Amino acid sequence: MQWWQILLIVLGSIAVLAVLTILLYKPVFKRFWDIVISFTGLLILWLPMLIIGIIIKADSKGPMLFKQKRLGKRKKQFTVLKFRSMCDHAYEKGGVATSEGDSRITKVGRFLRKTSIDEFPQLINILLGQMSIIGPRPILDWEYEEFADEKYEPRFKVRPGMFCTVDVKYRAEASRELQFQMDTDYAKHIKFSTDLKTFFGIIKTVLSGKSVYREENKNE
């Protein structure tokens, strides 16, 4: 087989995959790409993540990872994973609200939050099928109780995301109401183009250094 024939087969396969991804994104290929990206990400990042974990341990007492129960698809509870960015037992010392000057946030934690590197362990959640790369923000029980409303139910029919559409424009500046509304709108109209735009938008937002803090109910 000639090299150009191989090239045509490869390009044709890519074209077919691209078309199928666009046409069958929500029912099939969103999960397919979640698996591909999370598996590849963990394969590439396992050593840097291990080094980050060691640095976290050296910087302050406590575990490498922060674990917290969140509500996922169909309101099923799961344990979300993040690199620990606050001192151990931080919530016992000051509740869940944080601000930029919060003394509970470690030196390493400030950098992890600013760059969103603290979210990397969620690649494990994604590979396990508990989360998606892009989706509604995984919420706490009390948040659901506070904003329980039929109009927000569509957001619980899809997997929560490592990143969400709100992160692109507002990051931590959006109100809870706006967060829930945008998450619901996203869940109703999932498209490949939206996820792609959000993915690259997140990178731009992180590089811009937009605040990762808000005055009320900002969680680890």
PLM regions: where:
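Hydrophobic structural segments characteristic of membrane proteins
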Residues: 121-220
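Feature marks short, highly hydrophobic, charge-poor N-terminal signal-anchor/signal peptide-like helices
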Residues: 1-11
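Short, glycine-rich, amphipathic interfacial segments at transmembrane boundaries or analogous
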Residues: 65-104, 162-181
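Cytosolic-biased juxtamembrane loops and peripheral soluble domains of multi-pass membrane proteins
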Residues: 26, 30, 89-107, 111, ...
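A hydrophobic, helix-centered structural microdomain
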Residues: 9-88, 192, 197-220
